[in-house]
Structures are given as C-alpha cells and as structure tokens.
Amino acid sequence: MKRSKRHAATLAAAGIAALSLTAAPTANAGQWESGTFDDSFSETFDECGYDVTEEAHFVGRYTISKGTKKTGGQFFRLRQQVSYEGTFTNEETGAYFTESWKTNYREMPATLVDGSDSIVTVQTKESGVWDTIRDSSGKVRYRSAGNLVWSYVFDTLGDSTPGGEGISDEFVRTSGNWQTWDADFCAIVDELIG
C-alpha cells in the first residue's frame, strides 16, 4: 500500500467532514460559509498481511468564499486547515506507532475555460508537516514536510453553489523533504510493528 494514496484518502475524508460535519457554520461578507470540524474513526486493515488497527482523530477549520467574479460567481474557493493524530496497533502483538500531520490547503483564483460558463481551471497549494511517524518510544522515525501544487479542471455545474465535478488533475510541483510521500506504507508498518 503506497503511503500517498492512504494519506490522500484520509485528507479527502477531512474535506468531506468540512462540508458535512460542521459545527455552527458562519459567514461574513466575503464568505459563503466557514466552520470547524472534529471527528474520530477506527478501522482495521489487513493489506500488510496481518490486522492493524488505526485509531485516529482529526480536527480542522475551513472557509468557503463566495463565488468569484472571474468565474461569473460559479467557483467558490476553499481554504482548510487539518490536524491529524493516529495510532496504528498490530492486533496480534500489541506493538504500535503513532502518526501526526498538519496541513494547510488553499485553492487559488480560478479561471473559466474559454467558451464555457461553468468549467474552470484552478491550482491548489497545500503545505505543512505531512507526516511525523514515531515509534512506541516516541522517537521520530519518518518525517515529511513541504509544499504541493496541483492543477485541476473542474466543472462547477453552473448552479451558483459550492461543489461540482472534477474533470482532470495534474501534479505541478513539490518542494520540501518527503520521506513518506511515495513510501511503501506496509514496509514502514513491518519495520515498526511487524
């Protein structure tokens, strides 16, 4: 199991939480909505050849801006901060390690695709400490931190509300130290608790 895919799935869950598990969303003159989220989950997986349970908690806040003028009011920019703490336990042995991360995500101004009134291109920037993985003694074993930039083509559906459908995405660039970005997560699990 590749690390980047598992991390992206957790981050996507946080994004969904931002839109569905909000606590007292509010808005000011330039915002569609803003709020906070706080959620926990537990899951057991066996992709590494034995049962590993992840107990996790993430919190964050988000702001969705009102539709931007350059897109005819159709694109709503998201800014989000997420913090995650998790413990991974080998169910057979009780051995465990912890992982934490904190990221800041922001969508840059979007541009309408020529000839369209709902399809936009947008870049996203995400920065932070992507992973700090510690063994059971608390020693840092892996750490990833830096910046990621992606470019997306997105159909807003022309309904003047946040959301829509992704059409394509392209990785643009990265900077920083990425010990875990494309690592074999099961190799890390085996090393620390296998």
Regions found by a protein language model. Name each.
Residues 1-29:
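Secretory targeting and sorting signals
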